Amino acid sequence: MGSLVRLAGAAIGYGRPLLRDLDLEVRSGDFLAVVGPNGGGKTTLLRTLLGSLPPLGGRREAAPSLRVGYVPQREAVDPLWPLSAGDVVLMGRVRRAGPGARLDDADRERARHALERVGLADLWHRTFHNLSGGQRQRTLIARALAAEPDLLALDEPTSGMDPAAELAAMDLLRDLHQGGLAVVMVSHRLEAVANYAARLAFADQGRGLWRVGTLDEMLRPEALSALYGRPVTVREENGRRFVYPEAGGGRAA
């Protein structure tokens, strides 16, 4: 697998470092999930990795002509514009073609294919604001896919979803990854990614903590206990892994 983007000895933050000495590489076919508490530096790390925020120290290296499909945590589509789901997905083709470029039938076909990949082929003409929350998120993922990216990057893609919608969204990302797409996502919920990602990174700028490893390495109870600062156990139920604080009180976030 080839390297897509890499941070070496990086310090990240806005004006002052939130986290230092970060070494992280994303390769073709990777599925990396960045987890940690709210305000822990996850989005800052993602923005630095994608190049929209320069590192304060160290360096960032990216493959030539790297194409990234980005799905932000919150997307504001002005309700005064009655955009259809298809219109939103076509924005991805505009980004791929560049400012001022005119879209042709081939662009529309690729956009339709992107919407089909996320299971919404029959909603091309549906007004975006009349979609459910889960359908809107899938449409935004389709917009990112329409740009034919090498890397799909998502910031809290399941935020605000109910458990069924979260599971469906993660199943979609698993399918896209298994189809050969590299995926990097940010989540504050470890359980959302524990059965999907190939690697986990943990970021908590409040404690200056940064760890990255394979899923098996990071989901060891002793590793999680050190990261979360309290005893944690991992159980497998019906083929899925769940994370629990040993003191009781339900699953860990």
Predicted regions and their residues:
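ABC ATPase nucleotide-binding domains
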Residues: 221-253
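Catalytic Walker B motif of ABC-type/P-loop ATPase nucleotide-binding domains
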Residues: 152-155
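Conserved catalytic motifs of ABC-family nucleotide-binding domains
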Residues: 148
